[in-house]
Curated annotation (Swiss-Prot):
This is Probable tripeptidyl-peptidase SED3. Its cofactor is Ca(2+). One of its GO terms (cellular component) is extracellular region. Binds 1 Ca(2+) ion per subunit. The keyword NADP does not apply. One of its GO terms (molecular function) is tripeptidyl-peptidase activity. Residues 19-198 form a propeptide. It holds the Pfam family Pro-kuma_activ. One of its GO terms (biological process) is proteolysis. It catalyses: Release of an N-terminal tripeptide from a polypeptide. Its main location: secreted. Ca(2+) binds at residues 538-539, 570, 572. It comes from Arthroderma benhamiae (strain ATCC MYA-4681 / CBS 112371) (Trichophyton mentagrophytes). Its EC number is 3.4.14.10.
Length: 593
């Protein structure tokens, strides 16, 4: 039997009586069950869960400044990316901090053999009954309203002994309910259109790799595969990249890339089934354009979702197969030696920022920064809900608010919005953007974003955070992409298309730098807002939409008449600084120190 959110209040009141907070500090506390989820029954007490504990860091600002220095052209440390050993040494907490946490875990009954001390993170496997005693909480199955077959074992609140409060920043999976969404268009409601394979190419109607090459001044440039220049593509939610579809796409739309291929990395029992009948439009789109434009070496990182599970110590039961994919993928990547890391990572998934617990968003953003420190360009699509979909806060206040997206709102990723049409390009109505409510505006954005805010004036005052990190950073075509999936040509739209297209251009720029014996670009944003700015074409037409009175789940929500971020001269929160001009960017990066 499923329980609506208002039914669980007595349960959690009873829980606080059973577990008094004497000498304990609450780490995370959700005001209610997040929208779209209902509570079910408690899990079996013997159910095992794999927990990730983020250790409180004392030198976060110092670390972030190091990342900025490494990534800012002209700085004496530019391009001096850190090795895994150097990064771990920089972030490792004091020994007494680790000892306190490890002692608490062992005294709480966590099997010593299951504990992995990775410095700034500690991972361990524990039963539900032990976790409930240790965190003084109750776990339940929570079910997705739209897809009741999807469930997660979660809680709304947990605490730790007060003596550990400053050492334990976060423990997950506990309060993180949201699941990444594929960034497929949700405002214009474009449907997949099936075409014949000999459709005439018209770049105003259908985008192909050749269209992007012409539009972004790439010409016939084809990079030579280089093991130092790997482009990674993220795969979540049982999206499978099919080799047969990929080869056919190259034959149809990028014959100059014949021979290109990709390998697969399986994270947390993630699979890449070649004969599945499931929709794989997202995976096909991402891998086909990442490689169809770059010819780089490529890896498809498939992270476990709802597919079949092969039990192991970390995931002994099918019902445990609800791990947080961002954390699983990030910890996997950061564990790799330098030579095995991708130089570019493209991800076309995200969720509303407010659906993510605040500590989770900061801890995850720190992991993205760690990838940047090691020389990875982390690229995310900005989302497909324009200024916002529900436009309502999910706290007790329930006020009208534009909805920024995460992880696009993290200052250490490069977020990509969407354009359409050519001569001129225009901002699409669905391209997400705005200003983070969690992450403050980074210094590299100050001039560009403030210029926009000065022109905006009081319009939309109170609906966004003018001091927040601006989204997106850049943009690229995102409408009417031809892909090949399940033996058919399909037309798809969304910032899901923009991200791999932009990532491919970055991979090509990396190839130019490596040929000149220079390091890869790594974390991009200081470059984009600095020396690279002249390599982007400003988009001044079009604008985003949103807040139309109903959410993506068709629930009634506040409407904001004419809500929009307009594309204007300079940076704007729908197209960023603009779309890339490869010819100019290539000249800049070739000699950049």
């Amino acid at each position: 039997m499923l329980l609506r959110w208002h039914s669980v209040i007595p349960l959690f009141l009873a829980m606080t009586v059973a577990f008094p907070n004497t000498y304990r500090t609450v780490v995370e506390d959700l005001p209610a069950i997040p929208e779209g989820w209902v509570q079910g029954n408690p899990p079996s007490p013997e159910t095992s869960v794999r927990m990730n504990l983020a250790v409180g860091q004392q030198n976060t600002r110092t670390f972030e400044q190091i990342v900025l220095d490494i990534s800012t052209p002209g700085h004496r440390n530019y391009g001096k990316h850190l090795s895994r050993r150097d990064l771990k040494g920089l972030l490792r907490p004091r020994r007494e901090t680790s000892n306190l946490i490890l002692s608490w875990l062992e005294k709480s009954g966590v099997p010593k053999r299951s504990i992995v001390d990775d410095g700034d993170w500690i991972h361990f496997v524990i039963s539900i009954s032990q976790a409930e005693r240790m965190l003084q909480t109750r776990f339940y199955h929570f079910h997705d309203v739209q897809d009741p077959g999807i469930s997660m074992i979660r809680t709304l609140k947990y605490s730790v002994p007060s003596r550990l409060a400053r050492h334990v920043y976060m423990i997950q999976p506990t309060t993180k309910f949201g699941k990444p969404k594929k960034h497929a268009n949700s405002i214009a409601n474009l449907q997949a259109i099936y075409l014949s394979t000999n459709a005439t190419e018209n770049c105003n109607a259908t985008i192909t790799p050749r269209c992007l090459r012409e539009l972004y001044k790439m010409g016939d440039y084809v990079a030579k595969p280089d093991c130092r220049n790997v482009i990674g593509v993220s795969g979540y939610l049982d999206q499978y990249a099919r080799y047969s579809d990929f080869y056919k796409f190259l034959e149809l739309y990028a014959p100059e890339m014949k021979g290109a291929n990709f390998s697969v990395a399986h994270i947390g029992n993630g699979q890449n089934l070649q004969n599945s009948t499931r929709n794989s439009i997202e995976a096909s789109l991402d891998i086909e354009y990442a490689l169809g434009l770059s010819n780089a070496s490529a890896v498809f990182y498939t992270t476990s979702g709802r597919g079949p599970l092969v039990p192991d110590l970390d995931q002994p039961e099918q019902e445990h197969n609800s791990n947080e994919p961002y954390l699983d993928q990030l910890h996997y990547l950061l564990s790799l030696p330098q030579e095995a890391l991708p130089a570019v990572l493209s991800t076309s998934y995200g969720e509303n920022e407010q659906s993510v617990p605040e500590r989770f968003s900061h801890a995850t953003c720190n992991l993205f920064a760690q990838l940047g420190a090691r020389g990875v360009s982390v690229i995310f699509s900005s989302g497909d809900s324009g200024v916002g979909s529900s436009c309502l806060t999910n706290d007790k206040k329930k006020i009208t608010r534009f909805n920024p997206t995460f992880p696009a709102s993290c200052p250490f990723v490069t977020s990509v919005g969407a354009t359409f049409k050519i001569n001129p390009e225009r901002a699409t109505g669905f391209s997400s953007g705005g200003f983070s409510d969690r992450h403050s505006r980074p210094g590299y954005q100050n001039d560009a974003v403030q210029h926009y805010l000065d022109k905006l004036g009081d319009r939309w005052k109170g609906l966004y955070n003018p001091k927040g990190r601006g989204i997106p950073d850049v943009s690229a075509q995102g409408a009417n992409f031809a892909i090949y999936d399940h033996g058919k040509v399909i037309i798809v739209s969304g910032t899901s298309a923009s991200a791999p297209a932009f990532a491919a251009i970055i991979a090509n720029l990396n190839a130019i730098r490596l040929r000149a014996n220079k390091p890869v670009l790594g974390y991009l944003n200081p470059f984009i807002y600095g020396k690279g700015r002249e390599g982007f074409t400003d988009i001044v037409h079009g604008g985003s939409k949103g807040c139309v009175g109903y959410s993506s789940t068709n629930r009634s929500t506040p409407a904001v008449p004419y809500a929009s971020w307009n594309a204007t001269e300079g940076w704007d929160p729908v197209t960023g600084v603009g779309t890339p001009n490869f010819r100019i960017l290539a000249k800049i990066v070739q000699h950049m120190e």
